[in-house]
């Protein structure tokens, strides 16, 4: 076991500073949000328990009577956020495993057994996960008072309400570390460590058009029967609506990956610059890596496109909206934008992590282009196109698609909601593009090694 610890220490020391900081941040941010999301669910649950014992707890027209509805919304938001949180933790582990063939080969050549070599890599990832969990827990604790700026059910969210407790803090920290270990182990399964060297197994991923075809069929069916279903009654209409929306959720990943693959092929064929051609080919070669960066943002954007104009239209309905209804509608809007903002923050860091992985994985390509005389900023411009174009199309497009999907249930109006949703999408795209600039130090380090090799 001492050999494994020594090997893990050697791997830690071989890390560059930029990758180490990014790996810790990729563990810390999702852990902080995981604790905050858990605290929010617990806060609404505690409020519902108190409301159930109040005099108006059985009155569905009062805020106390709607407390259980808020709990349901909190669980729904938590479900939406848990996917990008887990994905980011896994991506942080993959960042630790990228381009480690040389380090692993050195450990193998000095006599460390293949199993112990892999265990050392897993241990190294767990060390970064522990540091990330500690930093994330501190970030969560420090930001607790800031939640008081948000008001739900007519009163602010208190720091004491958002505190999850020591037990939940320890359990979720352990869960994040176990997720890192599992992700690292799965990544190591793709690495072959033999006496002759170290190599990664790779499989060419296929992109199927089945998902987009099903999505188009579902959208056409909904636009055809949606209005009719709503005329049959609220219960029947909502059941049909939720059924169609659930079916679209099941195939959203297939649609997203296929769309990015198609977009990449179009960019490569229609390109008028070498940067655009390289960006398009990289997107077409690995559309799943691009989708992982902001797929969750596109999904939540679809929901914002559905719900925000709808609630805005309801709030403009006139005399039927009493004070309680206005509070509930305002809380729904606020909750959706909060969920979207958290997803954007996760998506931005996820973009930085996944782009760093792609930089490390394409190090040989960067070196080859540099030897051929490519300008220093060539790959940076290509990378910006690779991030900005699909981010804009997928995030803004998903919101617009959500608004189209909701059109059978909406009357005229909702213009304010449309503008707010669209502005949020544009801000999200800008944030993701800015986050991708975190890969610049890595690329400069690779180019510096090329210049040293020439000298």
Residue positions per predicted region:
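Hydrophobic multi-pass inner-membrane translocation pores used for secretion
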Residues: 2-7, 18-19, 23, 204-214, ...
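Membrane transport/envelope proteins' first extracytoplasmic loop
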Residues: 1-83, 323, 327
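Short juxtamembrane loops and helix-capping segments at transmembrane helix boundaries
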Residues: 51-61, 147-164, 320-325, 405-420
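Alpha-helical transmembrane segments and their helix-start/interface "positive-inside/aromatic belt" motifs
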Residues: 12-32, 115-131, 168-169, 240, ...
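Transmembrane helix boundary and interhelical loop/hinge segments in multi-pass membrane proteins
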Residues: 89-110, 355-367
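Small-residue-rich transmembrane alpha-helices
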Residues: 36-42, 87-93, 129-154, 170-190, ...
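Long, hydrophobic alpha-helical segments
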Residues: 75-92, 342-349
């Amino acid at each position: 076991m001492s050999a494994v610890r020594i090997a893990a220490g050697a791997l830690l020391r071989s890390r560059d500073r930029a990758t180490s900081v990014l790996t810790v941040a990729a563990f810390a941010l999702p852990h902080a949000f995981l604790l905050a999301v858990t605290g929010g669910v617990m806060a609404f649950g505690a409020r519902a328990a108190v409301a159930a014992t109040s005099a108006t707890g059985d009155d569905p027209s009062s805020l106390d009577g709607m407390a259980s509805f808020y709990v349901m919304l909190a669980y729904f938001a938590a479900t939406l956020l848990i996917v990008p949180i887990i994905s980011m933790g896994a991506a942080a582990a993959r960042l630790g495993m990228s381009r480690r063939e040389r380090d692993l080969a050195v450990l193998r050549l000095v006599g460390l057994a293949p199993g112990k070599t892999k265990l050392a890599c897993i241990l190294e990832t767990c060390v970064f996960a522990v540091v990330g969990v500690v930093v994330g827990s501190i970030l969560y604790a420090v930001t607790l008072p800031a939640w008081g700026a948000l008001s739900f059910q007519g009163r602010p969210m208190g720091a004491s309400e958002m505190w999850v407790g020591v037990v939940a803090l320890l359990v979720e920290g352990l869960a994040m570390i176990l997720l890192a270990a599992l992700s690292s182990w799965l990544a190591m399964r793709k690495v072959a460590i033999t006496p002759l060297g170290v190599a990664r197994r790779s499989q060419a991923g296929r992109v199927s058009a089945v998902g987009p075809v099903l999505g188009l069929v579902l959208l056409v069916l909904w636009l055809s029967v949606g209005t009719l279903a709503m005329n049959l009654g609220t219960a029947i209409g909502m059941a049909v609506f939720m059924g169609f929306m659930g079916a679209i959720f099941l195939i959203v990943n297939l649609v997203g990956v296929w769309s990015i693959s198609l977009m990449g092929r179009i960019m490569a064929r229609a390109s008028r610059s070498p940067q655009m051609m390289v960006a398009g080919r990289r997107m077409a070669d690995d559309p799943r890596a691009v989708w992982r960066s902001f797929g969750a943002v596109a999904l939540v954007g679809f929901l914002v496109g559905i719900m925000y104009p709808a609630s805005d239209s309801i709030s403009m309905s006139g005399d039927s909206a009493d004070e309680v209804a206005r509070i509930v509608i305002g809380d729904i809007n606020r909750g959706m934008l909060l969920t979207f903002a958290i997803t954007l923050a996760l998506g931005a860091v996820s973009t930085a992590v996944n782009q760093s992985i792609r930089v490390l994985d394409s190090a040989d390509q960067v070196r080859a282009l540099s030897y051929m005389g490519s300008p220093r900023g060539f790959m940076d411009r290509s990378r910006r196109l690779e991030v900005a174009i699909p981010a804009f199309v997928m995030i803004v497009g998903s919101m617009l698609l959500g608004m189209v999907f909701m059109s059978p249930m909406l009357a005229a109006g909702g213009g304010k909601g449309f503008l707010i949703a669209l502005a949020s999408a544009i801000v999200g795209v800008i944030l993701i593009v800015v986050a991708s600039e975190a890969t610049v130090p890595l690329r400069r380090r690779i180019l510096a090694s090329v210049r040293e090799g020439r000298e």
